[in-house]
Amino acid sequence: MRTVIGRWLLALLAIAPAACETVPDYPNRPLTAGAANPPPSDLIGADPVAPLILIAFSGGGSRAAALGLGVLDELAAQTYPATGKPVSLIDRVKVVSSVSGGSVVAAWFGLVGPARLDELKSDFLARDNMATLEWDAADPVTLARLSLSSYTRIDALRDLLDRELFHGARFADLRRPGAPLVVMNATDMESGEVFAFTPQRFDDLCSDLDQLPLSVAVAASAAFPVALSPMSLRNYSYEECKGAIPGGGWISAELTLPLPRYINLEEYKRARYANALRNGKDAYRNEHYLHLLDNQGVQSLTEVLVSPHSPGRILDAVNSGRARRIVVIAVNARADADNGVGGNPAAPGLLKVVNTVIGAPIDSTTARTNASLQDLVDTLKSAGASTVRAPGQPLFAGLRVYNISVDFDQFLPEQHQLQIAVKNIGTSWSLSPTQLQEAVEAGRILLRQHPCFQRLLLDLNARPVLAEPATIRKSCPFEDDKIS
């Protein structure tokens, strides 16, 4: 039986004509000069103690999508009493940040909502998508397109996603009532910056996000270096808008005032990047075209939490007292399969090298960015214990941040067999029926048994919880526990 990476390599070799540089057919369209993309609707709601759930889905192909689906399934199964009727936790998911395989489940959830989540299995995850890519790559029509036109390897993945799952859906279709803000992420090859598919970022490009197919963002998010070519977008700010783009006041303030770069360097860097994309004054680089590759979605979730200019405006809600319970769920589909390299005295062959190039950076970067998110959440939790607010500073008093990680290393000893099984699922777009069932079940189990998820259920008076209340409070403590 061919290995997972052997299948990647077969597809690579089959579409080798695409290895040369091509001028792509850009999938994004311009805005009318002076126009802006519609901002996200209000995410917070009227009840400050209702949980505000933010999720980051990591990469890992279909393994990551199935794990994320399991997490959403568990949220859908849990309800808590509220005024009038029980509320499902999945209805409190307000922001989903994603990358690679995680973007498949993020985009699907944003598009169809909780009721049709399970269709992701039959429409995509249960299918041998690697075989489809192989057949598409070997098709004479595809080969002709690859060699004679701007069609590239990433377009083959985009077409697969659109044909099998999204069926022409665009970002405008995500703006349904009650839908979460979905932030799919990639990396800008020119600058190395995170490129998030948000209304603000597409304002920077003078480009219409509503008209962009969802398959473009998912494919860009999943563009593994080497295995897939980048997804390319055109920056219309240089011609159609000529630098005249609304909504840039915060950028000007960050770049011209002397203190912002010392107070919040990351926010200053974000402003600098946005200014460059907008063809603004004294831009540090000119990017007429963007070429996007795989990235890590946790970084954008961090920005949503701390940036006063992020699309979700979570910090504003905290500052105004409109959000007192924030739930951060970082779903890490990092694999840990033994590839046999360390036990073999011979130098690894081409298959092993390509496997490492594709898989290892995804897994290691996921671990690093999750650690950064952990530091941020710890800081917010500490601030939540404060009862004093300086003038102009966020009101953190009484804020509870439930920090929940879903990671294959968190299985209990009695769940060892399931742990080994899911850790050995390769990074590809195909799962066996057993692998699909195991990955979804892993997501449900790992979320359900996390101490801070149990603490959330306890604080919401939801049932059932898996341990005595005192044990749960001890496992996921808050500073105000000492007071109450």
What are these regions (language model features)?
Residues 5, 20-484:
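Catalytic domains of lipid- and phosphate-ester/thioester hydrolases
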Residues 10-14, 470:
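Processing junctions and N-termini across compartments
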Residues 1-9:
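Bacterial N-terminal signal peptides that target proteins for export
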